[in-house]
Amino acid sequence: MLLLIKLGFIGLAIETLIVIVVWAIVYRIYREVKVEEKISQLRQRIRDRAEDSGNESDGDAEELANLLPPDRIDQDNWV
């Protein structure tokens, strides 16, 4: 009986560790998706403003440059 209780606690501890790892991975992916959505919205807003007024105002380009990694900024079509 004591052995079953010990095995139960060990199983519970292992399950808890697995749940923590899985949720950490899910949260990391969720944050990446949210950043990509924000980048897409900023790009679209910059394109719309460029079409409407011919300029990029309100610091959207700077905010987008802060969100993008440096290797993606060097590309010609980052907006």
Curated annotation (Swiss-Prot):
Keyword terms: AIDS, Apoptosis, Host membrane, Host-virus interaction, Inhibition of host innate immune response by virus, Inhibition of host tetherin by virus, Ion channel, Ion transport, Membrane, Phosphoprotein, Transmembrane, Transmembrane helix, Transport, Viral immunoevasion
PTM: Phosphorylated by host CK2. This phosphorylation is necessary for interaction with human BTRC and degradation of CD4.
Modified sites of kind Phosphoserine: 53, 57
Single biological process term from Gene Ontology: receptor catabolic process
Gene Ontology cellular-component terms listed: host cell membrane; membrane
Positions with biased composition (Acidic residues): 53-63
Notes on activation and inhibition: Ion channel activity is inhibited by hexamethylene amiloride in vitro.
Superkingdom in the source lineage: Viruses
Residue ranges, Cytoplasmic side: 29-79
Gene3D superfamilies named among the record's database cross-references: HIV-1 VPU cytoplasmic domain
Topology with respect to the bilayer: Single-pass type I membrane protein
Location relative to the cell: Host membrane
Residues that span the membrane, as ranges: 8-28
Region named Disordered: 48-79
Signal peptide segment: none
Subunit: Homopentamer. Interacts with host CD4 and BRTC; these interactions induce proteasomal degradation of CD4. Interacts with host BST2; this interaction leads to the degradation of host BST2. Interacts with host FBXW11. Interacts with host AP1M1; this interaction plays a role in the mistrafficking and subsequent degradation of host BST2. Interacts with host RANBP2; this interaction allows Vpu to down-regulate host BLM sumoylation.
Domain notes for this protein: The N-terminus and transmembrane domains are required for self-oligomerization and proper virion budding, whereas the cytoplasmic domain is required for CD4 degradation. The cytoplasmic domain is composed of 2 amphipathic alpha helix that form a U-shape.
Miscellaneous field: HIV-1 lineages are divided in three main groups, M (for Major), O (for Outlier), and N (for New, or Non-M, Non-O). The vast majority of strains found worldwide belong to the group M. Group O seems to be endemic to and largely confined to Cameroon and neighboring countries in West Central Africa, where these viruses represent a small minority of HIV-1 strains. The group N is represented by a limited number of isolates from Cameroonian persons. The group M is further subdivided in 9 clades or subtypes (A to D, F to H, J and K).
Function: Enhances virion budding by targeting host CD4 and Tetherin/BST2 to proteasome degradation. Degradation of CD4 prevents any unwanted premature interactions between viral Env and its host receptor CD4 in the endoplasmic reticulum. Degradation of antiretroviral protein Tetherin/BST2 is important for virion budding, as BST2 tethers new viral particles to the host cell membrane. Mechanistically, Vpu bridges either CD4 or BST2 to BTRC, a substrate recognition subunit of the Skp1/Cullin/F-box protein E3 ubiquitin ligase, induces their ubiquitination and subsequent proteasomal degradation.
Matching HAMAP family: HIV_VPU
Family: Belongs to the HIV-1 VPU protein family.
Protein name (record): Protein Vpu
Organism: Simian immunodeficiency virus (isolate EK505) (SIV-cpz)
